[in-house]
Amino acid sequence: MAVGKNKRLSKGKKGIKKRTVDPFTRKDEYSVKAPSTFANRDVGKTLVNRTSGLKNANDSLKGRIFEVSLADLQGDEDHAFRKVKLRVDEIQGKNCLTNFHGLDFTTDKLRSLVRKWQSLIEANVTVKTTDDYLLRLFAIAFTKRRPNQIKKTTYARSSQIRAIRKKMTEIMQREASSCSLAQLTSKLIPEVIGREIEKATQGIYPLQHVHIRKVKLLKSPKFDLGALLNLHGESTTDDKGQKVEREFKEQVLESV
């Protein structure tokens, strides 16, 4: 008989299953909060493994990026074609405080804008806000018919496209460089920059569907907790009572 391991002895009993542990028992739920520039601050919930040993739950949450529909943040279905990226910068209790990280259009909206018989004009610019956020803004615009136009096509000449693109970059540079990231977000929601471009280029060629279709965050400044808390409507300073000065009056006892 050959010397070796007896295979029949090493086999375990049939029917005994390995005990499975539910992974969700080791997880905690955190609320994701959007900055106060948006109407609805409750983004949703996120799960993370509970703090154990050297692994801290807060470190796992910081840096997470959430893509949310602007319609949910504003409570208005007219903004459904725009997506906002929010990045977790700080954890306060069970709340994840986020900051603006970017903006984009849905693919179906972009595809629906592109049509025949018109010119598509695109421009992008890299700009720094007053609070040192480096952003790249992408704009898109389409030509439209002039009043009382009989011709079917609305193609702009190359010289007109160059002039329109120059105006687009100038307006984006001016609007973004003169404000903070929070103020720029407030401009992007009602599409203030798009309307400015449409108004400024009216003399060159009439435009329609002028949008800032994408905002990309290239570089962030050094993290400032106070600025983030102010963005979320909170404060780091403690309310302290004022010192009240009173004149000392010696108490006179009438009876002993």
UniProtKB/Swiss-Prot annotation:
Keyword Transport annotated: no
Give the Basic residues compositional bias ranges. 1-18
- Provide the alphabetized UniProt keywords: Acetylation, Cytoplasm, Ribonucleoprotein, Ribosomal protein
Xref: InterPro entries: Ribosomal_eS1, Ribosomal_eS1_CS, Ribosomal_eS1_euk
N-acetylalanine: which positions carry it?
2
GO biological process annotation, one example = translation
Q: Where in the cell is it found?
A: Cytoplasm
The record's section on SMART domains has: Ribosomal_S3Ae
* Tree of life domain: Eukaryota
Cross-referenced PROSITE patterns, in alphabetical order? RIBOSOMAL_S3AE
Gene Ontology terms, cellular component aspect?
cytosol; cytosolic small ribosomal subunit; extracellular region
Q: Describe the family membership recorded for this protein in Swiss-Prot or TrEMBL.
A: Belongs to the eukaryotic ribosomal protein eS1 family.
Name this protein carries in UniProt: Small ribosomal subunit protein eS1
Q: Which organism is it from?
A: Emericella nidulans (strain FGSC A4 / ATCC 38163 / CBS 112.46 / NRRL 194 / M139) (Aspergillus nidulans)
Q: What is the lineage of its organism?
A: Eukaryota, Fungi, Dikarya, Ascomycota, Pezizomycotina
